[in-house]
Regions:
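A short acidic, Gly/Pro-enriched loop at the edge of an enzyme's catalytic core
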Residues: 70-85
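A short SAM/SAH-binding and catalytic strip from SAM-dependent methyltransferases
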Residues: 83-96
């Protein structure tokens, strides 16, 4: 969908320093990174076939992109080693999104940023009813995608606070096109 690419073009160029991309997939975000301010991208994805495509796409970026074939819920990397994390259209498919967000929180440096663009639960009850109704079947045919995840609530519960949050529909069926995008930072520890 064209609107998804527009959101990538808005959010991904904000990434800086050492970047962790959760759900790197086939590398759809590569062309949107600003490698003048990005030192390295480490991509995490459990899908071997997608990572193979991403690896071939990454060859034009002078070894600035590397890959780890793991799930987002348990990443074998040192804590507080990334300046920012990019998550794009991935929280809908992660089986345990709160565990994944806890890992993101652990891996981010203290003042690091989480840049996100996701689709999820719509604000209108009438659309939500359809999202809930269609979710089980959709999940089976769309690679585990959950139509009805409340992305705002997940990110807050995952230990973050919003620096910038935008929510709106893009072109497309309402059950698929409600977008959450912006920047979050680690919430203060109490």
């Amino acid at each position: 969908m064209e609107g998804f690419q527009k959101k990538r073009a808005q959010i991904v160029p904000l990434a800086y320093g050492r970047v962790l991309e959760i759900g790197i997939g086939s590398g759809l975000n590569f062309d949107f990174y600003n490698f003048d301010i990005v030192d390295e991208v480490v991509g995490v994805d459990p899908a071997v076939s997608s990572v193979a495509i991403a690896e071939s796409r990454s060859s034009k970026y002078d070894s600035k992109i590397s890959f780890i074939e793991e799930t987002a819920e348990s990443i074998a990397l040192d804590s507080e080693t990334f300046d920012c994390v990019v998550i794009g259209y991935t929280l809908c498919t992660i089986p345990e999104p709160l565990l994944a967000l806890a890992e993101v929180n652990r891996l981010l440096k203290p003042h690091g940023s989480l840049f996100f663009m996701e689709h999820g639960l719509a604000p209108e009850e009438s659309v939500q009813k359809w999202q809930h109704r269609l979710a089980p079947g959709w999940k089976k045919i769309a690679g585990g995608c959950n139509l009805n995840r409340n992305i705002e609530e997940l990110i807050l519960t995952g230990g973050f606070e919003f620096k910038d949050l935008k929510k709106k529909y893009i072109k497309g069926p309402k059950i698929l096109s409600f977008q959450y995008y912006g920047e979050a930072v680690k919430a203060p520890q109490h």
